[in-house]
Swiss-Prot record:
<comment type="subunit">
    <text>Interacts with LMO2, possibly leading to regulate the transcriptional activity of a DNA-binding complex containing LMO2. Interacts with OMP.</text>
</comment>
<dbReference type="GO" id="GO:0045944">
    <property type="term" value="P:positive regulation of transcription by RNA polymerase II"/>
</dbReference>
<feature type="region of interest" description="Disordered">
    <location>
        <begin position="1"/>
        <end position="38"/>
    </location>
</feature>
<dbReference type="GO" id="GO:0005102">
    <property type="term" value="F:signaling receptor binding"/>
</dbReference>
<dbReference type="GO" id="GO:0046872">
    <property type="term" value="F:metal ion binding"/>
</dbReference>
<dbReference type="Pfam" id="PF04538">
    <property type="entry name" value="BEX"/>
</dbReference>
<comment type="similarity">
    <text>Belongs to the BEX family.</text>
</comment>
<keyword id="KW-0479">Metal-binding</keyword>
<keyword id="KW-0488">Methylation</keyword>
<dbReference type="InterPro" id="IPR021156">
    <property type="entry name" value="TF_A-like/BEX"/>
</dbReference>
<protein>
    <recommendedName>
        <fullName>Protein BEX2</fullName>
    </recommendedName>
</protein>
<keyword id="KW-0539">Nucleus</keyword>
<dbReference type="GO" id="GO:0140678">
    <property type="term" value="F:molecular function inhibitor activity"/>
</dbReference>
<dbReference type="InterPro" id="IPR007623">
    <property type="entry name" value="BEX"/>
</dbReference>
<dbReference type="GO" id="GO:0005634">
    <property type="term" value="C:nucleus"/>
</dbReference>
<dbReference type="GO" id="GO:0061629">
    <property type="term" value="F:RNA polymerase II-specific DNA-binding transcription factor binding"/>
</dbReference>
<keyword id="KW-0963">Cytoplasm</keyword>
Amino acid sequence: MESKVEQGVKNLNMENDHQEKEEKEEKPQDANKREPVVALPFEAGEYYVPRGSRRRFRVRQPIAHYRWDLMHRVGEPQGRMREENVQRFGEDMRQLMEKLRERQLSHSLRAVSTDPPHHDHHDEFCLMP
């Protein structure tokens, strides 16, 4: 079982390295996609070229992409493990949503109800005969 987990981790590391190499190869292409440089007159006979920001390349979101990849890749040997992880992730999300819903309902019901909060010994303070 551990060998399968270790193998899955190695495969993920290899995929991440491969994606990083692809990103490095894509950077020169992104640099070519920039807007054309406009030369502005600086002084007589000289031109000033604005440099602008260099962070114009596309920013990737690896975490969201990894989750999508995790959910949709089932045909591989590690597919069953990933499917179990997705099911566990779904169960955790359902539990969190139920807890959140219960807390929201308890707060809203407390605000709507006119009854005072009941204690174990509330009869001691009752003024009714």
